[in-house]
Amino acid sequence: IFIVSEDLEDMDRGLSSFGAEIVQFNEVEQAAAQTEGISLILLDEFARGTNPEEGAMIVRAVTRYLDKQPSVSVLTTHYDGVAALASAHFEVKGLKDMDMAKVAEEIAASDGHIKGADIIASHMNYGLYRAQGAESCPRDARNICALLALKDEILKDI
């Protein structure tokens, strides 16, 4: 089992988080290639340390590469266009079945005793389901912003 995860910034070596991720990925890829049998490679939010456009291109290229390797690879990402390249696409159920009005009432009734983020987290479903076809990724960010009382002036521009 090989994992590339967390902030890997290495100031002693002069590496940014992104540079350190690439170094670690190369090490993982080489170790997996030398392993007999099938390896499990886990990439958590790979290429998050660079700009979103290049990060998405890198993750798509890595996905295509890993799909050809004798391994099982699991990538978590927020980048669009990656899932279409994967052999299988799973998503966190998230807030998909959440009743927004009910949660807004819970937050309003909490009188500040329970943080809104904690109430939202209590409704979060971290279960995975297999996404079908070109199903788009969940778009919960605006709803969360509204529940957490981001100013209306900002919300109207989202």
Q: Residue locations for each model-derived region?
A:
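ATPase nucleotide-binding head domains, primarily ABC-like/P-loop NTPase cores
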Residues: 1-158
